[in-house]
């Protein structure tokens, strides 16, 4: 077995499509087995962005298996700690260990100034993009600690975790919070040889970003913005 993470197991949230799928496939290419979760359903009735589906998660599963790697996949909401823990525990029992946590799941909604953001949009955003990250790490990190072999945790923040943009204040707050989680987990888990980092993507060609609502948000100067206008 060859590859940079050969013999490792990675837990990835939001793995049905987009960045989560790309992480799963890339890690599998480098020799890792995968525990993959995604809600595969709307986060709330107010969600404007089409959600990932069970078929999307099945496609991720097939892509990993076609690379000769094992995968445990389940439909799980990152807001549900008990469900997350159950899947991680089952995955570790089946795959034998856990080395990497990739807390990637996230949503986009709204598009109002903070003083006009609805309580529902605010709550959904914080529950998924901030609390969901914390719950994902909390559910999985005991395995890294108990193994005593270190490990790696990657939290998906955003360029919005480094600076502010108008009309996305709840998203900005959540992603800045992810940076706080990263820094705190890093100082708390360093004694176990576990390193913790955040990544900060900008515009990414995924369904979460390349949709009518988001394109209109970022290009209000255009009547009908398209993907080319987002470059």
Question: Where are the language model's segments positioned?
Answer:
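Alpha-helical segment proximal to the catalytic Tyr-Lys
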Residues: 142, 187-191
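The beta1-alpha1 cofactor-binding region of Rossmann-like NAD(H)/NADP(H)-dependent oxidoreductases
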Residues: 54-55, 75-87, 119
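Active-site loop-to-helix junction immediately N-terminal to the catalytic Tyr of the SDR YXXXK motif
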Residues: 117, 164-172, 184, 212
